[in-house]
Amino acid sequence: MKRLLFIGVIAVLSLGLVQAQRQPYRVVFDLTSRDSLDQKAVLRWLKEVGTASPQAQMEVVMYAKGFELVMPERSLLINEVKEAMKNPNVSFKVCAIALKNNNVYKSQLVAGVETVPDVIHELVSKQQDRWGYIKVMH
């Protein structure tokens, strides 16, 4: 009887371990800077994570001046942004409030970039959904 109970406990624990291993790799990058070092870093990380874990879901959330990364007229890295956007598991999202505060329109952003009404809500929601969080800074 004890042996059967022991086997049952091991089976349940093993099931939990399998579930833990199946957790998706999801990370949100918080970019607020127009600094090219920060922008290069986030683009490099997208590439490195995508190579190491092809199924990883990655999102770059931009506000303050970070959204300039996805503005063709202001970004020095626009080709790298477009390359990163070819990965279907990568998304770029910009805070609508930041755009409004800076008199920038969505039409000025690279096609495919999404806007979110409130970036703080986006970040908190992602964390509640168990996304990893990385603040991009140097």
Predicted regions and their residues:
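Bacterial Sec-dependent N-terminal signal peptides
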Residues: 1-22
